[in-house]
Design a protein with these regions (language model features):
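Residues that define the transmembrane beta-barrel architecture of outer-membrane proteins
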Residues: 21-23, 34-38, 84-90, 107, ...
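Outer-membrane beta-barrel "beta-signal"
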Residues: 91, 95, 182-195
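Membrane-embedded beta-strand positions of outer-membrane beta-barrel proteins
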Residues: 25-29, 40, 52-56, 92, ...
């Protein structure tokens, strides 16, 4: 319980007024080899070539053999090999822009590296919502990371659109839902705006 309290304090400090001097806020969509999710980030510049990032992600892990079958008589879909596992990475890292001043227009390629703690929420595989996510919920803490490349496209209204391709490093403490890691390739689409 102390770890969850520490984790929540860390998350709330990221969104507090004490760091209101950050240059960019943003959100986006993750589509990965092992699942999909959303991310929320804050970015601030150290120089034209280097930015620092903090982000929290909500990542819904999928079983590699998960399938959805449609019942044509009722129109209802059924999932098989479904797992209930949410990962909440809280990563900090940097974006490096190697081509500053070398590429014209509003296109800015970058390299990104992030690392930090991961809270894994493992719900039961069957039952009601309460039985899956409240009564039978297990949680674990580990450390993980991300590295990748991408590009920012700056628009005229102070919005930055980003696309990134990278690799998640998401280890687990032992076997959780059949695997001890959920590493995999990841494509990220993001939208940032100046604060």
């Amino acid at each position: 319980m102390k770890k969850i309290t520490y984790y929540l304090i860390l998350i709330s400090s990221l969104s507090s007024q004490s760091i209101s001097s950050l240059n960019y806020n943003g959100f986006g969509l993750d589509i990965g080899e092992r699942g999909s999710g959303l991310f929320f980030n804050r970015t601030w510049s150290n120089s034209e070539k280097l930015c620092f990032i903090s982000e929290i992600r909500i990542f819904d892990v999928k079983h590699p053999d998960e399938i959805i079958i449609q019942d044509y008589y009722t129109g209802r879909g059924y999932k098989f090999n479904d797992i209930n596992l949410l990962l909440l990475p809280l990563f900090s890292g940097a974006k490096y822009y190697p081509f500053v001043g070398k590429i014209a227009n509003n296109f800015a390629p970058f390299v990104s590296v992030k690392a930090g703690p991961i809270l894994s929420l493992d719900g039961a595989e069957s039952g009601t919502f309460k039985e899956k996510w409240i009564t039978n919920l297990d949680y674990y803490f580990t450390l993980g990371g991300y590295f990748g490349i991408g590009a920012d496209v700056l628009t005229s209204n102070q919005t930055i659109l980003s696309i990134r391709v990278g690799y998640d490093i998401l280890p687990m403490k032992g076997q959780i839902d059949g695997s001890d890691q959920y590493n995999g390739a990841l494509v990220r689409f993001g939208c940032n705006w100046k604060k």
